[in-house]
Design a protein with these regions (language model features):
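Conserved nucleotide-binding and Mg2+-coordinating catalytic segments in signaling enzymes
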Residues: 1-18, 36-50, 58
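GGDEF/GGEEF active-site signature
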Residues: 59-124
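Short regulatory alpha-helical coupling segments
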Residues: 11-30, 61-69
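Active-site-flanking beta-strand signature of metal-NTP-handling nucleotidyl enzymes
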Residues: 32-37, 75
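Catalytic-core segments of nucleotide cyclases and related cyclic-nucleotide turnover enzymes
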Residues: 50, 93-100, 104, 120-149
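PAS-family sensory domain
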Residues: 29-31, 73, 148
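Short, conserved catalytic or interaction motifs in soluble domains
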Residues: 46, 88, 144
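Cytosolic nucleotide-binding catalytic cores of signal-transduction proteins
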Residues: 28, 55, 63, 77, ...
Length: 149
């Protein structure tokens, strides 16, 4: 089965689900799940074209691969304009700040940024999708804050 997203060259959703299943089975308490979503991505595609949207996704993927995570971490394109990171460090807030800083440095004819939701793994998580739901709820809260500004 193909496990690489053809646009970003990141792990794809199928590989992500398999990896999250393995993470939950390992019960390693030193992990965080981050869900990232590109802010105003529909507007980027509508106003600048899908080719620019694709370039933005590739640039974000490269930023995450090369600058923001350690080799022991896992990154995937969940789908559309969403990315997932399994982070095995202990400074998740610092990681989020680094991600925002690196993305801000990218040069595009439009504002490019992401919202990030994250959740630590804990002993009450028994299924990978429960962990994902926790991080996704935090992402939703971040997106709501952005809209309220």
């Amino acid at each position: 089965m193909i496990s690489i997203d053809p646009l970003t060259q990141l792990n794809n959703r199928n590989r992500m689900e398999q990896h999250l299943f393995e993470c939950v089975r390992s019960q390693d308490l030193n992990m965080y799940l981050l869900v990232l979503d590109v802010n105003r991505f529909k507007k980027i595609n509508d106003e600048h074209g899908h080719a620019q949207g694709d370039l933005a996704l590739k640039a974000i993927a490269n930023c995450l691969k090369e600058s923001c995570i350690e080799k022991s971490d896992f990154i995937a394109r969940y789908g559309g304009d969403e990315f997932v990171i399994v982070y095995k460090g202990n400074d998740v807030k610092g990681l989020c700040q680094r991600i925002h800083a690196y993305i801000k440095k990218l040069s595009f004819p439009f504002d490019l940024d992401v919202s990030i939701g994250w959740a630590p793994y804990h002993k009450d998580i028994h299924k990978w999708n429960d962990w994902f739901i926790e991080a996704d709820k935090q992402l939703y809260n971040e997106k709501k804050k952005l809209k309220d500004r």
